[in-house]
Amino acid sequence: KTALIEGALWWNQAIEAAGYINGFQVKVLPEDVDPMDVRYNVIQWVHRSTRGWSYGSSVRDPRTQEILKGHVTLGSLRVRQDYLIAEGLIAPYGEDDSIDEAKDKLSEFALARIRQLSAHEVGHTLGIAHNFAASADGRASVMDYPHPLVTLDDSGEIVLEGADDVGIGDWDKRAVIWGYQDFPDGTSAPEGREAIMRETLASGLRYVADEHARIGNRSSAGPVHPAGCLWDNGSDPVAELNRLMALRKVVLANFSERAIQPGRAMATLEDVLVPAYLMHRYQVEAAATVLGGQTFTYAMRGDGQTTMQRVSAKEQRAALSAMLATLEPEALALSDAVVSLIPPRPPQSGVSRELFPRHTGYVFDPMAAAGTAAKITLAQLLDHKRAARMNSQQLADPGLPSFADMLSIVINDRWPEARDARLVAIARMVPVVLVDELASLLAHKA
């Protein structure tokens, strides 16, 4: 409850930036008040057994769209999921006397995310949309979807502190100032807001909306703006993918039975392994936007913004190299030390969509895990929209790569060579996934 209230109160920073001191308050609702009462803005805490969304809704006057009541629904599932993510990152459960300390570290990681989530959903009730460019602008808004910014210290240890940002962002302040600012008598409100907009543009803050960050489903190559992606970090999506792959290598090397508490079924190690093994998946999507990518703005005539600029050939080649590195057998392989820790699920515990698919019945399947990760990368590289964009960009600038240029590199890089025997099976599996994705591309009707 405390974390939820603290996160919601971050909006007072934006309200005060608009000139209203202590103008945003969050208090516990009296027990005798109906949370559906339209006179009260409400945050409700709900429980859910599986993963799902939280919501920032509002009741509006249909005539004017004035917000009459904000109603936020936050799900407890987020605490459980972030706890699980942290367990996989640091495998914290060592000796019995260290378990309480580990739980404190995991709890703070999860609560930091709840603060951010609370602020995010309250932002929606204030009428503020997502801004998926914020993570590329130094985490400039709580209205992005933040990926935990986990780092390595100088000794190579995983650092969870600072994984989620604290406080309202500069973009959020600008949005509140534009939307809620009152103007002195004699000042034209349209002119005042136009001045606010000019100041915001001059600050360099960027904006990418929902419809240009997640077109279609998760496997489609919707986003084209390298800054406008979900669950990514950093101003350079390719550099961040390389950094995240190095971090992932350390996480998987350290993965052990210490990732679950004593007394839990060893088979549940797979639950913890899945988000750790696939921790790079969203950054792969972000790096893929560089291929055939364009930086663009929602420019208005006369406002001075650059409408569109294609990503350079050098940056596109770097993106392809980084994505192909995620397909290396060394990156896809799980050590036998990890695989041998995971037995079949206990009776009646069952399997779910939260686990890797498998071709081995009830036995853990490391090849299926590798295939899942390979498909994430190859589906992005071989999407029909990305293919069309790359061909289009070369028509405009012959120095930029076409889809055929990229495909030649992908195919020639993927056919297996002689390798360590432990990695041969994976080296052979990746071209199979490649051919499958090529078949899907060929089946697409233009």
Regions found by a protein language model. Give the residues of each.
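Extracytoplasmic/secreted envelope proteins and their assembly/folding machinery
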Residues: I5-A8, L111, R115, A119, ...
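Conserved catalytic/binding loops enriched for acidic/polar residues
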Residues: D137-A446
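The catalytic-center signature of Zn2+-dependent metalloproteases
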Residues: V28-H47, A112-G167
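Active-site-adjacent "gating/activation" loops or surface patches in catalytic cores
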Residues: R48-W53, S57-D104
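Extended catalytic-interface subdomain
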Residues: R60, E66-L74, D82, R115-L126, ...
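Short pre-active-site segment immediately N-terminal to the catalytic Zn-binding motif
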Residues: T2, S98-S118
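Sec-exported extracytoplasmic/periplasmic mature domains
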Residues: L9-Y20, G123-H124, I128, P148, ...
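Fold-level signature of zinc-dependent metallopeptidase catalytic domains
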Residues: K1-D34
